[in-house]
């Protein structure tokens, strides 16, 4: 099943931030969001709320059409990851991934994001750790200057 605009937990015009309520019927759904320059994928639902609130502020309203955010739990299978890369991430300039745990926590997704970035060096991949113990190892695989 392909989801483009399903019942989101968090709603902003045209679902720029997407968080699908966690029920079993959604576990294999394919996710698509409109293209944007900036993509934020996170393990933390509260991050989505913060971004949503930020985009509601008048001085950041212009960013609404250029940022997408998604909870990582919506990208569990290889098919979901591949589809999201093809339909949404391929059009981005910057992807920020915030993950709890090490690279193995979302290994296939990280591998595909690294391939996405390697294909075009102008693209930027920022990987943030949700825990201090993985901060260095995840930052090292980001494509931004570490200094």
Regions found by a protein language model. Name each.
Residues 2-147:
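An N-terminal assembly and electron-transfer interface module characteristic of large anaerobic redox
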């Amino acid at each position: 099943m392909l989801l483009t605009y399903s019942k989101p937990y968090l709603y902003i015009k045209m679902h720029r931030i997407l968080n699908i309520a966690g029920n079993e019927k959604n576990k294999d759904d394919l996710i698509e969001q409109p293209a944007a320059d900036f993509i934020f994928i996170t393990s933390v639902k509260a991050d989505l709320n913060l971004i949503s609130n930020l985009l509601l502020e008048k001085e950041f309203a212009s960013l609404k059409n250029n940022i997408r955010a998604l909870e990582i739990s919506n990208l569990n299978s290889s098919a979901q990851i591949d589809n999201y890369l093809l339909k949404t991430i391929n059009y981005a300039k910057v992807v920020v991934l915030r993950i709890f745990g090490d690279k193995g926590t979302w290994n296939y997704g990280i591998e595909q994001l690294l391939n996405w970035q390697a294909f075009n060096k102008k693209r930027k991949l920022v990987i943030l750790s949700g825990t201090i113990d993985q901060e260095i190892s995840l930052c090292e695989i980001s494509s931004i200057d570490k200094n």
